[in-house]
């Protein structure tokens, strides 16, 4: 229940798993000495088997990841979003790296196994950085918020092929309220300590949260997305002959109760907090580097985490200003060349609105665009 996209750790692990499936290494293809080649292959096979074990262990931390992969273990649960769970998972990652380094010889691996080693170790290092700055990352936000992710996840990934699957869905709705409570308490604490979203992010969260609990059974409007999904999945069981029509109606009644008992209060508590704290949010903050505790350190860490550059934030900012200045110079040169009089903003509006700068909305225009 972390994000509206594939959980970060899972995405990295899938990339890691793909590396395990990579073609044979250069040493294997080039006809290296048989004994040496066999030793490399043996060590690489041992490591890859170990990776398979650890990946299976890692998935146990995330019922959501298991479901995304099409598996039904822990199907009635959501991820534990408590601080204690995060500490346990980070400790597990650290222990796996220590075990890997003590049990295997990096220099005795083939090229692909070394890449897998590097990726596994990098996953731990990235997780450690994220954990170090976990308070700086917004608990709810308009881009990757749990308030939009969980309904999307349940609708798109929680398949119902039996009554047990349907009951697991309802259990997840109950777990949603508990998870929201944990996250909301963290968001409150963070905001009080200066880790607060900008106003537009609050507004985005509010819009998304309100949308989830708009419509039946929450109000008199058309069916909400979750309610429509639950009804369709109950009817699907009846259509498949798994249950009869009467049982499907019973399941729908249970689903309606779960939405009102768990989802409605969870979202309304989030909405109430966001509405109340909105007045404290800055309209257009300068950025986390200057508005958050340890913001400058967090910004530098995120630069290293998301890019391959060693430049510091000040250098990158300077490059940005220089690039804006360069582009403006080039645009002014174009304005002068075409004889346009007015400001740069006027020129942008002129280009955007004058039909002569647009391809016609025809097959010929589309072909010309291509």
Task: Annotate the PLM regions.
Residues 21-27:
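N-terminal signal peptide c-region/cleavage motif recognized by signal peptidases
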Residues 28-370:
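N-terminal maturation segment of proteins
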Residues 1-11:
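Bacterial N-terminal signal peptides that target proteins for export
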Residues 9-21:
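Bacterial N-terminal signal peptides
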């Amino acid at each position: 229940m972390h994000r509206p996209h594939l959980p970060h750790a899972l995405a990295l692990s899938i990339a890691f798993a793909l590396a395990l499936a990579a073609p044979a290494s250069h040493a294997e293809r080039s006809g290296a000495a048989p004994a040496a080649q066999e030793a490399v292959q043996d060590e690489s096979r041992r490591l890859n088997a170990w990776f398979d074990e650890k990946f299976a262990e890692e998935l146990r931390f995330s019922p959501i990841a298991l479901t995304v992969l099409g598996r039904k273990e822990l199907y009635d649960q959501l991820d534990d979003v408590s601080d204690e769970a995060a500490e346990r998972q980070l400790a597990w990652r650290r222990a796996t790296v220590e075990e890997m380094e003590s049990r295997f010889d990096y220099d005795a691996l083939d090229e692909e196994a070394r890449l897998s080693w590097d990726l596994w170790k990098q996953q731990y290092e990235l997780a450690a950085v994220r954990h170090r700055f976990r308070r700086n990352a917004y608990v709810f936000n308009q881009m990757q918020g749990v308030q939009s992710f969980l309904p999307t996840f349940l609708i798109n990934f929680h398949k119902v092929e039996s009554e047990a699957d349907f009951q697991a869905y309802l259990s997840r709705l109950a777990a949603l309220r508990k998870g929201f409570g944990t996250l909301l308490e963290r968001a409150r604490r963070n905001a009080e300590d200066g880790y607060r979203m900008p106003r537009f992010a609050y507004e985005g969260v509010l819009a998304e949260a309100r949308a989830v609990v708009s419509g039946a059974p929450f109000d008199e409007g058309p069916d909400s997305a979750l309610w429509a999904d639950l009804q369709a999945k109950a009817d699907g069981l009846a259509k498949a002959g798994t249950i009869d029509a009467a049982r499907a109606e019973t399941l729908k009644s249970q689903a309606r109760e779960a939405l009102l008992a768990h989802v409605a209060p969870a979202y309304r508590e989030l909405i109430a907090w966001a509405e109340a704290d909105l007045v404290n949010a800055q309209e257009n903050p300068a950025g986390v580097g200057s508005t958050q505790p340890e913001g400058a350190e967090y910004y530098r860490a995120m630069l290293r985490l998301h890019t391959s550059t060693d430049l510091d934030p000040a250098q990158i900012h300077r490059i940005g200003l220089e690039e804006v200045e360069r582009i403006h110079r080039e645009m002014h040169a174009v304005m002068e060349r075409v004889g346009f009089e007015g400001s740069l903003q006027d020129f942008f509006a002129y280009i955007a609105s004058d039909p002569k700068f647009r391809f016609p909305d025809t097959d010929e225009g589309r072909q010309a665009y291509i």
